Every structure is written in C-alpha cells, then in structure tokens.
Amino acid sequence: MAKNKGVRIVITLECTECRSASASEKRSPGVSRYTTEKNRRNTTERLEIMKFCPQLNKMTLHKEIK
C-alpha cells in the first residue's frame, strides 16, 4: 500500500508577464508554467518566485496558481 505523502503538495507556477505581454514581445506563443512542490505547513501563502520565462527570454515573476 502507498504511504500518505504528508503536507507536501504539487503546485503550478505561472508567469505573470506572459499574460499581459503582446505577441510582438514574445519569442513564442503561450504562457510559461513550472510545476514544483511546497510544504503547506511552512509556506501557507501562495508562492512568488523569480524564474526564467522562455517565451519572453528573461527572468520574470512566477506566481502559484494551484
């Protein structure tokens, strides 16, 4: 039987600038998303991390969406 994973949950980080950027600024269409895990007990609020966005070709703010 499988064990319970505990307080760690899988979340998705989405680029905040990709949604508002026009098509001429982007290198390719779409929105940059990363999946990661977080400890719900230590980090109760939503994560905001600077990560590389391949569509805009620069470091941008990525926020937790789920």
Curated annotation (Swiss-Prot):
Protein keywords: Ribonucleoprotein, Ribosomal protein
Secretion signal span: none
InterPro entries: Ribosomal_bL33 (IPR001705), Ribosomal_bL33_CS (IPR018264), Ribosomal_bL33_sf (IPR038584), Ribosomal_zn-bd (IPR011332)
Keyword Ribonucleoprotein: yes
GO cellular component, as recorded: cytoplasm; ribonucleoprotein complex; ribosome
GO biological process terms, semicolon-separated: translation
Taxonomic superkingdom: Bacteria
Keyword Ribonucleoprotein on entry: yes
HAMAP family: Ribosomal_bL33
Membership in a protein family: Belongs to the bacterial ribosomal protein bL33 family.
Name of the protein described by the UniProt record: Large ribosomal subunit protein bL33
Gene label: rpmG
